[in-house]
Amino acid sequence: MKLIVGLGNPGQNYQFTLHNIGFMMIDYLLNTIITDKKIVKKHNSYIYKANVGSNLVLFVKPQTYMNSSGHAVKKILNEYKIILNDLLVLSDDIYLPEGNYKLKLKGGHGGHNGLRNIIDCLQTKKFKRLKIGVSQDHNISLEDYLLTPIDDKKKLMVQKSFPIISNIIKNFIQDC
């Protein structure tokens, strides 16, 4: 069983913000590679259970706020007895240009508070994360940049890598 967690903040106000790119990627996956899924609301999360090929996969959107995502991730890992090697976290990254991505097998939080909380709750940095570039606008505060809804043009720009990222995620799912 694989666990793919998209980081974001719950609620309409945050739906199309750069900080919610993890949620957007989960939605993209659910709409493109998943044909049959079951949704469960548990552990302050939306958990979408789906078969991808011969693998059972949990696609998760924690409904805690970003900075408390680790609590939900830990509970789900424990309940479903998923090992850390089968966890992939999707997050935004201001240090990568829009449309770029980086797969890391382990490492620090890079200043990302959602990743920091997961590391703190799991007490390890040894889990995979796929960082999706959102760039940074130094003319406004980081909080405003990440939490202000984006227009359609910007959304297309940051989502241009989603098909390639989807293939990386499919490879992760199929890796036994």
Curated annotation (Swiss-Prot):
The active site is at residue 19. It comes from the Bacteria. Its main location: cytoplasm. It catalyses: an N-acyl-L-alpha-aminoacyl-tRNA + H2O = an N-acyl-L-amino acid + a tRNA + H(+). TRNA binds at residues 14, 65, 67, 113. GO terms for biological process: protein quality control for misfolded or incompletely synthesized proteins; rescue of stalled ribosome. One of its GO terms (molecular function) is tRNA binding. Pfam families: Pept_tRNA_hydro. The record marks 9 as: Discriminates between blocked and unblocked aminoacyl-tRNA. One of its GO terms (cellular component) is cytoplasm. InterPro entries: Pept_tRNA_hydro, Pept_tRNA_hydro_CS, Pept_tRNA_hydro_sf. The keyword Transmembrane helix does not apply. NCBIfam families: pth. Hydrolyzes ribosome-free peptidyl-tRNAs (with 1 or more amino acids incorporated), which drop off the ribosome during protein synthesis, or as a result of ribosome stalling. Monomer. This is Peptidyl-tRNA hydrolase.
